[in-house]
Amino acid sequence: MRLLPLASVTLLSVLCAQAFAAKLEDTAPYPKAEDGFTRQVIHLPKQQHEDRYKVEILAGKTLTVDCNLQRLGGKLLEKNLEGWGYPYYRLDQVSGPISTRMACPDGKTREDFVPVTGDGFVLRYNSKLPIVIYAPKDVEVRYRLWSAADKTENARQE
């Protein structure tokens, strides 16, 4: 029974150490978010062969939509942390939504995540640095990981 408290303390120490190591300020002095913006951070786990992975940034808003395909517009711009050379990203403006114009006979609507589409939303995978994104306060940032298959195919000359 004496091992249980020791195990709990050890587990708590490990979790606290991981949480502390994941703090953005421990990596570099990234600027605070400006008024009207939030600073959102993604810490990626280490992968073997990180060159085979990509990170897709899904910035967007939850909106009321119908049967049509909805999209927002914007560009995710890469900036450089002066003196450090580390990248961070900024989504300055979000336009839209734009929508297809199909008739929706049932007239039903639902709440759904509508992503921003545009340039700069697919990033290189690098677990050594956090992905830091500055986005307008009303924009939610999600992400998806993409990985390449081990097998490659040859192109044919024609």
Curated annotation (Swiss-Prot):
Please provide the record's keywords in A-Z order.
Disulfide bond, Periplasm, Protease inhibitor, Serine protease inhibitor, Signal
Q: What is its main location?
A: periplasm
Annotated site residues (Reactive bond) in this chain: 101-102
Per the UniProt entry, the signal peptide is: 1-21
**Where found in the cell?**
Periplasm
**Cellular component GO terms, alphabetically?**
periplasmic space
Cystine pairs annotated here are: 67-104
Which GO-annotated molecular functions does the record name? serine-type endopeptidase inhibitor activity
A Pfam short name: Ecotin
Q: Which domain of life is it from?
A: Bacteria
Q: How does it assemble?
A: Homodimer.
Protein role: General inhibitor of family S1 serine proteases.
What's the family?
Belongs to the protease inhibitor I11 (ecotin) family.
Protein's name according to its UniProt entry: Ecotin
Q: What is the scientific name of the source organism? A: Pseudomonas fluorescens (strain ATCC BAA-477 / NRRL B-23932 / Pf-5)
